[in-house]
Structures are given as C-alpha cells and as structure tokens.
C-alpha cells in the first residue's frame, strides 16, 4: 500500500487512491466491519482516496443475487449489508476530508533496493512489485520498514529515479514534491553507480545519510561494468567512518553533511536527530499530514487494550481539536506543551477506534471534546425480545420471541439457517433510576451490521467493528422501546442455493474463482459444504449511565 502513497508523497501528488477490499475474505464472508478495519490500514499507509472496487450492472428484475463477478466482498444492492453501507461511507468520507488536505509529513526516505531483487534468481518468469513480496522477508529493507512502523517513524519509499531528482535543502532532502529529514539505504548488495554517486552529492550538500548495516557491495548491471566499478570503488575509498560518542554509530563527514552507519536503526535516527511518535509504544498507529491549519493526525488503536491518558505528539501548536469520524462528534482537546516543543493531548481510544487530531498553529475557541466516565455498572436490557424478519430470503422465517437477544441461526429450522436479509429485534426497558449526562448503549455482538431506533427516533447506524454508541440524556424516557434492525451476510443464502443446485453464477465471463482451495469445486467457487454463519443479535444489549469526565 505504501508503494502507491510513497510515489504520491515524494512527487507531491494530492491523491493516493486505491482499490480496496476486493479480495478481503472468501466470497460473501466480508462484513462492513472487516472492510472498515482494512480501510484503516490503507489510511495508515498514506492512502487518502478509497474507491472500493468495480461492480457489474444487474437488471432490476434479475432474481437474487443478480449479476455478480469475482470481487469477493460483493458490495451490491443485493447484499443485505447494503442497508447500513452508509455508515461506513460516512466514516470514510470524514477521514478523507482531512487526509486529502495539505501534504504528507514523513521524516524518512527509505531507498527501495530494486536491483537486489533483479539479481535474485526466482522460480517464475515474472515477479510483481505491487507490494512487498515474501521475497523481501529477512532483508535489511523489510526489517527497516517494519521497525519504523513499529517505532513510530513516518517514512516513504524512494526509487533510484526519484532519488536522482532529489536535491539538498538546508540539511534536508527536497524531492519533487516534499521535504524529508534523512535517507536510509538498507544494507543492499547492488546499486546503480549513478544512484550511489548522487547520494554522496546529497551528503556533500549537507544531508545526513544513513547506511543501515554497511555500504552497498557492488554496482548493478553489466553496461560499462569495468569503468563503473572503478568509479564506484573510488567513491567508496573516499569514505572514512570513525567512532562517535554513541558506540552503535559510525560517522564519516562528507562535505557539509555526513554518512552514518550501524546496525541499530533507532540509535542511528537518534544520532541524526530524527524524532519518532511514541504513541506506537501504546499500541496506537498513525499517519501525519501538514495542512493550512497546522498538522493533522489520523490515529487508530491497533491494540487489544483501551488507551486512556496523555499522548505526546511531535507536532507543535497552540491548540488542538478532536474529530470522531464514526459519530461526527467534535471538540477541542486538553493540551499542554510537551518536551522538545511538541504537543501533549489527553485522549481515549478503545480497540479498533479511530480519531482525527488537528494541531492548530493559532488559538481556537470552543467546547472541549467530551469524554465520559460510567456512573455505575451496565444494566442488561432484559425481558422479552421480539424478532421479526423484514426482508431477504430464500423465505422469511417465522417471527419468534426470546428472553434475551439471540442469533436467529440459534433457532430450530432450516429457514433460519438459510436466511440472508434483515430482522428487527424489539426490546422494551425501563430507564435505570440514576442521574446521567448521557447514556452508552452497547449492543454486544452483532452479526453483522445494525441500525438502531430508540422511541421512534433513529439514533445510530453501526456497520462495525464496534457496536456501541452514546445518546443524550433527553432521548431516554421512563419507558423505552429499542428497535434494532440487524442485517447479515449473503453467505447462508448462497450456500443454500449451491446445495440445491440453483444457478446464480450466470454472468458472462464471471470468473467466480474461490479464494480458498476448500471452496473450489471443478475450478469454480462453491459454498454447498458451508455450515450456517451465525447471524443476528447474540448481544447482550446493555445500557450504562455516563457523566462527563473532568
């Protein structure tokens, strides 16, 4: 993913766009929550424009599921999840509205050693370079990229041609469209002599260049090999590394700049004065951009534990604001000046939750972004739950009642197992006798998306992966009715069709290939052996009184 965004960032392009989630899971097994988590990874990699994938025209009167082709998430109106697709689209639109402003703000350029791959003998006639293939596993290049992501260093890949178009600028590297603090050349075996010579010119102009591991061993290619090799060796012979006050860093002064080498990348960055974002130590991931207002961060919690505390950011400013792309809540952040002139903000992030943080260079006025603390333990929404099937097929199962929310696939009967569509869960509850500023409604487990109506007012569309939301205290009455419309995957109905030999792979040149070998029968996808995918609202549904955090 960073291949595309790096090219855009280095050359100063406004957009880095991608086809997203096409083969996320096997056909019919991707939820909107799965897509949301995948799209977050695209954003973190520097992508700022998502267009999902193509989908084919299907006549209105075509029997379900209409015309489908190989794009495995099958985002079409025939998919029950289409009802709640707007929730995911609004989230993506809010994030993109920030990430499409300004320019990327990465500190490091990582040289892509393409000639090491060219020199390696492989089994195939063609190797694709649309991602970091397994062939890079264990290489200094892959190790450096993984470590920078883990340690919180923003970086872009750079090619030989892009590097030769880069010039020194007051100790920094100015590419065709951006500025960076240093260049990392990961221990590569081969490099064009023209590239190596230009790297030394950058150092001569004041840039600090990091050679991770050692200098390149040899030149690439066979054209004028003797002449180029002699020139390459003469350049290397003019480099004299000497110890520094850091035993893990060797330095060679070169003109106005320097060449650094060592095996510990973090120590090399520290010596070169390249800062990192320490939020990654807390299981958080980020992408950072500069815009007209200052600096914006897109931050996600990739870990399995909630984050609650002060977060140090490298960007300096006079104020900050928080924007929640999931529910559109906004407000100013509590801030203080951090060490080194950066900003510290108070933040809470649950696992799989994302926030946008805008650091402003000028003071901003407004209300604080509101975090909440629970007043008491959650209360279960118990009692009789009515379940009615609204739309879908192959037929609408009979309605049923249960003492708590349950998956409809837990009911006896093939109609429940085969159904793909939407069911309405209705539960009544009494407001707990507690004072609260707001209330948290948590649906528990949802299979696989939901829209929620409280006392006749639509209050949430929940595509996942999270299924909780906050409501104002005035929305909760003494006696309340909660309607939860749950939509599941296409999988169960498709499996029923395959078991019964009903044709649906009918679109010309459909290319309906299976992603997994066990689903490939006679060279085409087949779901007839699938067991029912759990569907509905296993819950439990809980409500929690909240007070404003001080």
Task: Explain the meaning of each model-derived region.
Residues 354-357, 439, 476-505:
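Short, well-structured beta-strand segments enriched in hydrophobic/aromatic residues
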Residues 459-469:
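Aromatic-rich membrane-interfacial microdomains
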Residues 469-479, 490, 542-546:
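Short, surface-exposed tryptophan/glycine-enriched loops
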Residues 312, 429-455, 462-463, 482-486:
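Aromatic-lined ligand-binding clefts that engage carbohydrates, nucleic acids, or primary amines
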Residues 349, 452-454, 475-476:
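Short, well-ordered loop/turn sites that connect or cap secondary structure elements
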Residues 1-422, 430-436, 462, 472, ...:
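Carbohydrate-binding surfaces of carbohydrate-active enzymes
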Residues 363-383, 387, 487-540:
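Glycine/proline-rich low-complexity spacer/linker segments in large multi-domain proteins
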